[in-house]
């Protein structure tokens, strides 16, 4: 926290590596640009974890701060600071099979899924003492990549975390993960990384409003229409869409809240 102090320390200490949440990294980047000090920072690398973050957020932070960012994955219950991280190709998370055994299951049935299929990550620790974990359900949604990474590292790959099974919202019978919305944002020109999804229910009918910020570097007058069309085609829900000016949605020094489910489901 304390953005003013963090920016001062980055300048005074000429730090070359930044570690934190991606939400806070974006906040620091935007504040540095706003104050005209982004080009004075010496950052070269960043490691972000503790939350799901997408490619548009990665691109935005890297453009402003002139660094390369890495996605680290970990759980308090297993090891610290992380149990996997992406490589220079940024095509997934390399994990360490000598320490953990990973499986993917159907979060509803518990059935083990084959490599490449999306499901809930289950981890068994192989060397942990004191509190070993057997088939621990992480609630994190990903898949195991059956192919070796082209970077040449011997460590297997899992996909970047799409979301959590307990963050899933059901809208008109369709399970929706926040990561799916971020993927649609990524493929829609003219949109930035920040969004909110607001779900209401009136007279027994669900409604969805998605607010997403415009990309300050790329104007697309059809962005709202294209995003709405892509949401319907890919996620199979109908949503109202508002494209808001850049930096109008709230920023966070911790984890950003994306989904607001205001339905009374009792």
Region locations from a protein language model:
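Active-site glycine/GP-rich loop and adjacent strand/helix microenvironment
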Residues: 1-266
């Amino acid at each position: 926290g304390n953005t003013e102090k963090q920016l001062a320390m980055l300048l005074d200490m000429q730090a070359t590596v930044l570690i934190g949440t991606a939400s806070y990294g974006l906040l620091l980047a935007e504040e540095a640009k706003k104050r005209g000090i982004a080009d004075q920072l010496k950052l070269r690398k960043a490691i972000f974890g503790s939350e799901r973050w997408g490619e548009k957020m990665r691109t935005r932070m890297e453009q402003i701060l002139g660094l390369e960012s890495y996605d680290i994955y970990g759980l308090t219950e297993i090891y610290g600071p992380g149990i996997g991280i992406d490589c220079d190709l940024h095509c997934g998370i390399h994990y360490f099979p000598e320490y953990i055994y990973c499986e993917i299951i159907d979060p509803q049935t518990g059935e083990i899924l084959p490599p490449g299929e999306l499901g809930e990550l289950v981890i068994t620790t192989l060397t942990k003492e004191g509190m070993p974990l057997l088939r621990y359900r992480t609630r994190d949604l990903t898949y195991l990549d059956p192919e070796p990474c082209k970077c040449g590292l011997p460590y297997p790959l899992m996909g970047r975390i799409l979301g959590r099974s307990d963050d899933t919202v059901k809208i008109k019978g369709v399970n929706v993960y926040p990561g799916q919305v971020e993927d649609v944002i990524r493929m829609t020109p003219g949109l930035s990384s920040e969004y909110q999804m607001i779900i209401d229910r009136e007279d027994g009918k669900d409604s969805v409003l998605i607010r997403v910020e415009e990309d300050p570097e790329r104007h697309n007058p059809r962005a709202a229409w294209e995003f709405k069309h892509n949401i319907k085609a890919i996620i199979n829900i109908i949503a109202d869409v508002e494209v808001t000016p850049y930096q109008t949605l709230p920023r966070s020094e911790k984890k950003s809240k994306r989904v607001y489910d205001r339905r009374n489901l009792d």
